[in-house]
Amino acid sequence: EEVYYCSDNTNGATGFKKKDGQYKQTNFYEKKFKMKLQDDGNIAIAEPRLSNGRWLYICSTPYEGRQSMEKNKSCVEEDNNGYYLNFNQDNGRYVRFSGFGYVFDNSDSDGVITRIGTCTKF
């Protein structure tokens, strides 16, 4: 297993939040998190607010079989809920995307968010 410390490298993330019944462009706070690249190739991201303490992303290698892609991960959260992660082990860059609420939920509680950042191996 490999452990990384990750941080959004923008002034927060960009996306949309529902306000007054409509989604409007907004900025979200920057996130920092610990991420574990597991021996099985999947990725766990620490999240103390969850009962099990983490998000688990099920990962595959993009363009399977291409040697240039073997250290890249394209992942979907284990519940297939609209949370995605792409990660490059060589340069530590990631993109996280969440888009559950706009499609599946009528409440104002969930936004559509894209985060970009970098991770450093512990």
Regions found by a protein language model. Name each.
Residues 1-5:
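N-terminal helix-cap/turn-to-beta initiation motif at the start of protein domains
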Residues 16-18, 54-60, 106-108:
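A short, polar/proline- and glycine-enriched secondary-structure boundary/capping micro-motif
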Residues 7-49, 82-87:
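Short, solvent-exposed loop/hinge segments that bridge or flank secondary-structure elements
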Residues 38-89, 118:
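Contiguous, well-ordered beta-strand patches that form the walls/edges
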Residues 27, 101-122:
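Edge beta-strand at a domain terminus
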Residues 81-103:
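A short, solvent-exposed beta-edge/loop patch
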